[in-house]
């Protein structure tokens, strides 16, 4: 709407031009609650000096460490990495995510990874339920923003980045039971292409009583209350 009168010095839309080279494309995505993203795709020349180059293959990738958490009893160790006051404000999935990730980094001898790639099938179910319950009980006028901010799938990966001061590549894959597979595949791509030397890969999920009842209706039983896997992958020296 209104594209016939573009903003001065702004981007002028077009209905399509022929015989015009396209080297850069800006893609925008706008979601509920300000969960927006922008992706800039650019075509580089083959002689680009700044483009990363490497001769690595998948055989050169090493797993420096692996940590797996499968029960809430395993979370007691989190006080070694995070202050008790902060821990009390975290849900069980966030605790599991932070503990497995920080412990894996410690075992690998890495303070700040070059990239963080996270997989999750269901995201932060506990906080999502609390948000929906609050909407049902209190309407949409005076909702607490905390439940929403801590219910999105990419909350986990973002919090790891904040804790480790990682400003590199950060993405979340939500591909059901294949989420970890997709996260590892992306990590291998970064390592083989020489973009990163170390990548923290994780897959984190939780279940709630309500969720377990719903899943039992479709024949899925014995879901773990929490389940986290964290890996540190590396390539090169």
Residues covered by each model-derived region:
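Conserved "HGTGT" condensation-loop signature of ketosynthase/thiolase-family condensing enzymes
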Residues: 1-169, 174, 181, 189-196, ...
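Internal active-site segments that recognize and position negatively charged phosphoryl groups
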Residues: 186
């Amino acid at each position: 709407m209104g594209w016939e009168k573009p903003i001065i010095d702004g981007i002028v839309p077009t209905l399509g031009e022929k015989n015009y080279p396209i080297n850069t494309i800006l893609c925008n995505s706008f979601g509920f609650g300000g969960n927006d993203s922008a992706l800039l795709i650019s075509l580089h020349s083959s002689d680009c000096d700044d483009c990363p180059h490497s001769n690595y293959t998948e055989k050169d990738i090493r797993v420096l460490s692996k940590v797996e958490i499968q029960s809430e009893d395993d979370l007691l160790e989190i006080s070694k990495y995070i202050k008790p006051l902060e821990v009390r404000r975290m849900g069980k999935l966030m605790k599991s995510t932070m503990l497995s990730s920080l412990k894996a980094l410690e075992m690998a001898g890495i303070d700040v990874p070059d990239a963080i790639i996270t997989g999750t099938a269901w995201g932060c179910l506990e906080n999502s339920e609390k948000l929906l319950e609050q909407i049902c009980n209190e309407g949409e006028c005076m909702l607490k923003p905390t439940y929403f901010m801590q219910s999105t799938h990419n909350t986990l990966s973002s919090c790891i980045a904040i804790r480790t001061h990682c400003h590199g590549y950060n993405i979340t894959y939500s591909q059901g039971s294949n989420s970890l597979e997709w996260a590892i595949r992306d990590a291998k791509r970064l390592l083989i292409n020489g973009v990163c030397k170390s990548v923290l890969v994780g897959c984190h999920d939780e279940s709630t009583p309500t969720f377990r009842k719903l899943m039992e209706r479709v024949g899925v039983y014995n879901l773990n209350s929490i389940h986290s896997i964290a890996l540190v992958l590396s390539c090169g020296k």
